[in-house]
Amino acid sequence: LTCVTSKSIFGITTEDCPDGQNLCFKRRHYVVPKIYDITRGCVATCPIPENYDSIHCCKTDKCNE
């Protein structure tokens, strides 16, 4: 599985997930109105959203773009 780890105006950076980590995730952490801190990567289980987080998990290559 290949997941996106970062995305910018220059393109995307990806990583091949290690054995046991079969999900890609994207976490949007609310900072201030219209501003989010976005984290992406591989996980074994989908994280539970905390505070003002929004989490998307998926199982296909680069699905967390």
Swiss-Prot record:
Expressed by the venom gland. Signal peptide: none annotated. It comes from the Eukaryota. PROSITE patterns: SNAKE_TOXIN (PS00272). Coiled coil: none annotated. Disulfide bonds join C3-C24, C17-C42, C46-C57, C58-C63. Its main location: secreted. Gene3D superfamilies: CD59. It is found in: Secreted. It holds the Pfam family Toxin_cobra-type. This toxin shows activities on different G-protein coupled receptors. It is highly potent on various alpha-adrenoceptors (ADRA) (subnanomolar affinity for ADRA1A). Order of potency is the following: ADRA1A > ADRA1B > ADRA1D > ADRA2C. It is also found to reversibly bind to muscarinic acetylcholine receptors (CHRM), but the affinity is much weaker (CHRM1 and CHRM2, Ki>1 uM; CHRM3, Ki=140 nM; CHRM4, Ki=120 nM; CHRM5, Ki=350 nM). Belongs to the three-finger toxin family. Short-chain subfamily. Aminergic toxin sub-subfamily. This is Adrenergic toxin rho-elapitoxin-Dp1a. It comes from Dendroaspis polylepis polylepis. The lineage of its organism: Eukaryota, Metazoa, Chordata, Craniata, Vertebrata.
